[in-house]
From Swiss-Prot:
The keyword Magnesium does not apply. GO terms for molecular function: acetylcholine receptor inhibitor activity; ion channel regulator activity; toxin activity. It is found in: Secreted. Belongs to the three-finger toxin family. Short-chain subfamily. Type I alpha-neurotoxin sub-subfamily. Expressed by the venom gland. Residues 1-21 form the signal peptide. This is Short neurotoxin SN160. One of its GO terms (cellular component) is extracellular region. The lineage of its organism: Eukaryota, Metazoa, Chordata, Craniata, Vertebrata.
């Protein structure tokens, strides 16, 4: 009986994938695509303009931004590319 219970617990953990992390893009502006694994459940893409032109920042989570910065948050892997 204990063996059956232990087997069910292991199968449940494997099926639920309790260690799931989200994959978000983290390259800046027009740099080559890079990704990172995140503990957060969302990715973001911030866009703004300055004296160098349009700037883009990508990363994990969904931060608050200042006025004049466009923020897009999403909830699937690499959705912020």
């Amino acid at each position: 009986m204990k063996t059956l219970l232990l087997t069910l617990v292991v199968v449940t953990i494997v099926c639920l994938d309790l260690g799931y992390t989200m994959t978000c893009c983290n390259q800046q502006s027009s740099q080559p695509k890079t990704t990172t694994n995140c503990a957060e459940s969302s990715c973001y893409k911030k866009t703004w303009s300055d004296h160098r032109g349009t700037r883009i920042e990508r990363g994990c989570g969904c931060p608050q931004v200042k006025r004049g910065i466009k923020l897009e948050c999403c909830h699937t892997n690499e959705c912020n590319n």
